[in-house]
Amino acid sequence: EYSVFGRVTPQQKKAMVQALQSQGHTVAMTGDGVNDVLALKEADCSIAMAQGSDAAKNIANVVLLDSNFASMPHIVNQGRRVVNNIRTAASMFLIKTMFSVMLSLLTIFFGNTYPFEPIQMSLISACAVGIPTFLLAQENNYEKFLRHVFINAFPAALTITSCVFAVMLVCQNVYHSTEMLNTACVLVTGWNYMAALKTVYAPLNTYRKTIIYGMQFIFFAAAVIFQKLLSLGSLDFGMIILVFILMTFAPVLIDVITVWLKGIYARSLDKENPGKFTAFIDKLRK
């Protein structure tokens, strides 16, 4: 399971780092001597000890002031927390951008009216993007496998656009009511955003569930209490059924598209040459 090398030359250390990088790995290298400088310089993340040589410390990205490698897990976890929280928050903001662009193009192409008032988008943005991402960013987030922003954002954006466009088609051909169109679109979009929150911030712990379900309650409560301020109207029985169907179908579609995109990404990683580093190790052993 493990390979241990003794008396490795600086050139061999550098070659080992390059072999791992050629397979798509992000490589960290630790060292404290002059003979480690080549590998430290080549690595994606170089770590030196405070008691090491000046050459190693000058070339390193990280210098452990206590010369204790046990500090690294805490350092890595803090980095993961920052990166993961930024990535999940960026996913939610990107959903809004992608959804707005796709819906704008559809309304221009089909000559329809944009189905949202500015104040209605303010409610959705506050309850589904601004407040929850701020509160959830305070949480410790130490996941090892980071999701890509696009994989998180695109399924929700596509689902929201599809559901809103379906409501637009029904209202245009059956109801001919702008107020009913706006109301149905706001409810469907807000619900889909909440479903996206569950996907982006999965797995859900108690804190995350409290924030997400709390935002759901605030969103629908605000839609009822501030109905006139938000330019929302009432829905008839047929539109209620349509909204209910879309709300039920949307989370499933988000999950299906997410799994599909992750499968494509996983297959792209499998195409990398898996034997290059193994061949290099065998060469060193000889």
Protein language model features and the residues they cover:
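Residues immediately C-terminal
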Residues: 35-36, 133
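Transmembrane alpha-helices
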Residues: 215-222, 247-251
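Cytosolic catalytic headpiece
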Residues: 1-35, 41-44, 86, 108, ...
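Membrane-embedded transport module
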Residues: 1-28, 43, 48-208, 217-228
